[in-house]
Amino acid sequence: MFELKTLFLFLATALAEIVGCYLPYLWLKRDGSAWLLVPAAASLALFAWLLTLHPTDAGRTYAAYGGVYVSVAVLWLWAVDGVRPTAWDMAGSLLALTGMAIIMFGPRHA
Protein backbone atom coordinates (compact mmCIF):
# COMPACT_ATOMS: atom_id res chain seq x y z
CA MET A 1 0.00 0.00 0.00
CA PHE A 2 2.90 2.37 0.77
CA GLU A 3 4.23 1.90 -2.77
CA LEU A 4 0.86 2.61 -4.40
CA LYS A 5 0.28 5.71 -2.26
CA THR A 6 3.79 6.96 -3.04
CA LEU A 7 3.36 6.43 -6.78
CA PHE A 8 -0.02 8.18 -6.78
CA LEU A 9 1.46 11.11 -4.86
CA PHE A 10 4.35 11.35 -7.34
CA LEU A 11 1.89 11.32 -10.26
CA ALA A 12 -0.24 14.07 -8.73
CA THR A 13 2.89 16.11 -7.97
CA ALA A 14 4.17 15.73 -11.54
CA LEU A 15 0.84 16.75 -13.06
CA ALA A 16 0.65 19.83 -10.84
CA GLU A 17 4.16 20.88 -11.88
CA ILE A 18 3.64 20.21 -15.57
CA VAL A 19 0.32 22.09 -15.67
CA GLY A 20 1.90 24.95 -13.72
CA CYS A 21 4.67 25.23 -16.31
CA TYR A 22 2.59 24.46 -19.41
CA LEU A 23 0.09 27.28 -18.89
CA PRO A 24 2.74 30.05 -18.97
CA TYR A 25 4.17 28.31 -22.05
CA LEU A 26 0.75 28.66 -23.72
CA TRP A 27 0.66 32.32 -22.76
CA LEU A 28 4.19 33.10 -23.98
CA LYS A 29 4.57 30.84 -27.02
CA ARG A 30 1.04 30.27 -28.27
CA ASP A 31 -0.55 33.66 -27.68
CA GLY A 32 -2.68 32.50 -24.77
CA SER A 33 -4.31 34.85 -22.32
CA ALA A 34 -2.27 36.29 -19.47
CA TRP A 35 -5.07 34.96 -17.26
CA LEU A 36 -3.46 31.53 -17.71
CA LEU A 37 -0.93 32.70 -15.13
CA VAL A 38 -3.57 32.53 -12.37
CA PRO A 39 -4.24 28.77 -12.61
CA ALA A 40 -0.53 28.27 -13.33
CA ALA A 41 0.39 29.89 -10.00
CA ALA A 42 -2.25 27.81 -8.21
CA SER A 43 -0.94 24.65 -9.83
CA LEU A 44 2.65 25.43 -8.82
CA ALA A 45 1.50 26.16 -5.26
CA LEU A 46 -0.27 22.78 -5.27
CA PHE A 47 2.95 21.21 -6.57
CA ALA A 48 4.97 22.69 -3.70
CA TRP A 49 2.39 21.57 -1.14
CA LEU A 50 2.26 18.04 -2.57
CA LEU A 51 6.04 17.78 -2.21
CA THR A 52 5.60 18.25 1.54
CA LEU A 53 3.32 15.20 1.74
CA HIS A 54 5.92 12.70 0.56
CA PRO A 55 6.86 10.24 3.32
CA THR A 56 10.65 10.39 3.08
CA ASP A 57 13.54 12.86 3.33
CA ALA A 58 13.36 15.81 0.95
CA GLY A 59 16.50 14.95 -1.04
CA ARG A 60 15.36 11.38 -1.62
CA THR A 61 11.89 12.60 -2.57
CA TYR A 62 13.28 15.07 -5.11
CA ALA A 63 15.63 12.51 -6.63
CA ALA A 64 12.96 9.84 -6.98
CA TYR A 65 10.33 12.34 -8.13
CA GLY A 66 12.50 13.19 -11.11
CA GLY A 67 11.97 9.71 -12.53
CA VAL A 68 8.21 10.02 -12.33
CA TYR A 69 8.34 13.55 -13.77
CA VAL A 70 10.23 12.29 -16.83
CA SER A 71 7.65 9.59 -17.47
CA VAL A 72 4.64 11.86 -16.96
CA ALA A 73 6.21 14.47 -19.25
CA VAL A 74 6.56 11.86 -22.01
CA LEU A 75 2.90 10.90 -21.55
CA TRP A 76 2.02 14.62 -21.68
CA LEU A 77 3.94 14.86 -24.96
CA TRP A 78 1.61 12.24 -26.38
CA ALA A 79 -1.71 13.18 -24.74
CA VAL A 80 -1.51 16.98 -24.88
CA ASP A 81 1.05 17.87 -27.55
CA GLY A 82 -0.10 15.08 -29.86
CA VAL A 83 3.43 13.80 -30.47
CA ARG A 84 3.84 10.05 -30.28
CA PRO A 85 6.80 9.09 -28.08
CA THR A 86 9.63 7.22 -29.75
CA ALA A 87 10.99 3.91 -28.54
CA TRP A 88 13.87 5.92 -27.05
CA ASP A 89 11.43 8.14 -25.16
CA MET A 90 9.75 5.06 -23.73
CA ALA A 91 13.07 3.38 -22.88
CA GLY A 92 14.25 6.54 -21.11
CA SER A 93 10.99 6.70 -19.16
CA LEU A 94 11.33 3.08 -18.10
CA LEU A 95 14.92 3.69 -17.01
CA ALA A 96 13.86 6.78 -15.03
CA LEU A 97 11.05 4.84 -13.32
CA THR A 98 13.47 2.05 -12.49
CA GLY A 99 15.74 4.61 -10.83
CA MET A 100 12.78 6.01 -8.90
CA ALA A 101 11.83 2.53 -7.65
CA ILE A 102 15.39 1.80 -6.51
CA ILE A 103 15.65 5.11 -4.66
CA MET A 104 12.24 4.91 -3.00
CA PHE A 105 11.80 1.22 -2.30
CA GLY A 106 15.33 -0.13 -1.94
CA PRO A 107 16.44 -1.44 1.45
CA ARG A 108 17.56 1.16 3.99
CA HIS A 109 20.58 0.33 6.11
CA ALA A 110 22.20 2.86 8.43
From Swiss-Prot:
Major localization class: membrane
Keyword field: Cell inner membrane, Cell membrane, Membrane, Transmembrane, Transmembrane helix
Protein's UniProt keywords contain Hydrolase: no
GO cellular component: plasma membrane
Parts of the chain that traverse the membrane: 7-27, 33-53, 63-83, 87-107
Location within or outside the cell: Cell inner membrane
Topological relation to the membrane, as annotated: Multi-pass membrane protein
Family of this protein: Belongs to the UPF0060 family.
Protein name: UPF0060 membrane protein Nmul_A0351
